[in-house]
């Protein structure tokens, strides 16, 4: 994610406020910390116009940075957007406020499938509201895959994890999300093993599979959209939103390219980004106002349409772009939800063991 700051309060107004404190009441300001470009283009401006609360939007460059800021305390933020497992650790560490449900207006509108997934998070579900979510799966250029393998098993990880099949797509480019936890979970689940395992025998099996694939992996990246659109990649294991963003970009450029996304039949991981209030937030009341504003169906639909990720609000689905709303690999049925692997907080020794497996894979010599 890009590291930029967006200040949605007039510099002149701030200057006057500092110069004439006797004439101005303190300006209402909400400080939030979120990924770049993770709202609709007019979300923040409309919130300010409606409430009079100015928004300072600081953009985080990684979940690790967010977690470090919260654990250190004194961040100055009123609202943050942690991922599900990060929120679990932060709540357990006492860095988040338990939410007052009486101040929230849309908790009953959360997608039922997400409500079930949230039961896996013992601590953070008391302190978070789901924002957007998604899965890890296969985004591919439909024409390029068909040219190379007309009967490609596009709904199966076999297309990537069987070396003899991956080899057929190496010339048009394969990428893999640069996330050891997500990829290893998907690989281990594919092998019939515990997705979050760090047992030596499980990691050895995962390593054996991955090393056979290494010659065919062109890139490790978390944002493959540009390479997909420019024709540098034809197959990517990554976020569900990649397909929507790639298709939108290609259409805007007048390219006659069809991208598709599939959740593998073997199962895959699911993630949720959430909204949470730091324990030392100075203006929690502004945070509640923003959460309620964002969770309105029309606002959540606008965010979903802009970001390419499904909304957490079930009532917003009707206003989401038809291509997303009617895609069963983005808005899921119960059977697909049942194949999803929720996040899990992994102990540090296990994380280090998994990271060693991942590093060995990434640094292995490719063709």
Describe every region a protein language model picked out.
Residues 9-19:
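Bacterial N-terminal signal peptides
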Residues 26-90:
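Early extracytoplasmic/lumenal segment of secretory-pathway proteins
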Residues 78-82, 217-218, 234-239:
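Paired acidic/hydrophobic, glycine-rich loop segments that form the ligand-binding mouth/hinge
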Residues 86-89, 235-255:
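A ligand-binding cleft/hinge motif common to bilobed small-molecule-binding domains
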Residues 87-218, 223-225, 229:
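Extracytoplasmic ligand-binding site segments that recognize negatively charged/polar headgroups
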Residues 203-211, 255-276:
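Periplasmic-binding protein-like
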Residues 273, 278-339, 343:
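Mature extracytoplasmic/periplasmic domains
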Residues 334-367:
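Conserved C-terminal helix/tail region of periplasmic/extracytoplasmic solute-binding proteins
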């Amino acid at each position: 994610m890009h590291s930029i700051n967006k200040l949605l309060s007039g510099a002149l107004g701030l200057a006057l406020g500092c110069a004439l404190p006797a004439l101005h009441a303190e300006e209402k300001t909400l400080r939030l910390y979120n990924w770049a470009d993770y709202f609709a283009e007019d979300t923040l401006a409309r919130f300010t116009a409606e409430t009079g609360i100015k928004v300072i939007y600081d953009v985080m460059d990684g979940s690790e940075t967010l977690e470090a800021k919260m654990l250190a305390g004194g961040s100055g933020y009123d609202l943050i957007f942690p991922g599900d497992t990060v929120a679990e650790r932060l709540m357990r560490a006492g860095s988040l406020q338990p939410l007052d449900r009486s101040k929230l207006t849309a908790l009953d509108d959360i997608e039922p499938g997400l409500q079930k997934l949230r039961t896996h998070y013992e601590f953070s579900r008391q302190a978070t509201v789901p924002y957007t979510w998604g899965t890890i799966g296969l985004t591919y250029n439909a024409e390029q895959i068909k040219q190379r393998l007309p009967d490609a098993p596009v709904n199966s990880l076999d297309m990537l994890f069987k070396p003899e099949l991956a080899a057929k797509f190496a010339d048009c480019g394969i990428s893999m999300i640069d996330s050891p936890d997500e990829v290893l979970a998907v690989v281990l689940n594919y092998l019939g093993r515990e997705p979050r395992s760090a047992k030596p025998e499980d990691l050895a099996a995962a390593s054996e599979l991955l090393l056979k694939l290494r010659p065919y992996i062109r890139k490790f990246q978390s944002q493959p959209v540009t390479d997909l659109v420019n024709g540098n990649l034809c197959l990517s294991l990554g976020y569900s939103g990649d397909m929507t963003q790639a298709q939108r970009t290609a259409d805007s450029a007048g390219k006659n390219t069809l991208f598709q996304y599939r959740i593998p039949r073997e199962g895959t991981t699911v993630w949720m980004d959430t909204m949470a209030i730091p324990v030392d937030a100075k203006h929690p009341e502004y945070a509640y106002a923003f959460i309620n504003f964002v969770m309105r169906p029309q606002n959540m639909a606008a965010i979903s349409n802009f970001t390419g990720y499904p909304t957490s609000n079930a009532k917003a689905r009707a206003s989401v772009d038809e291509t997303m709303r009617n895609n069963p690999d983005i808005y899921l049925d119960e059977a697909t939800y049942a194949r999803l692997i929720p996040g899990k907080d992994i102990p540090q020794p296990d994380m280090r063991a998994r990271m060693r497996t991942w590093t060995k894979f990434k640094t292995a010599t490719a063709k």
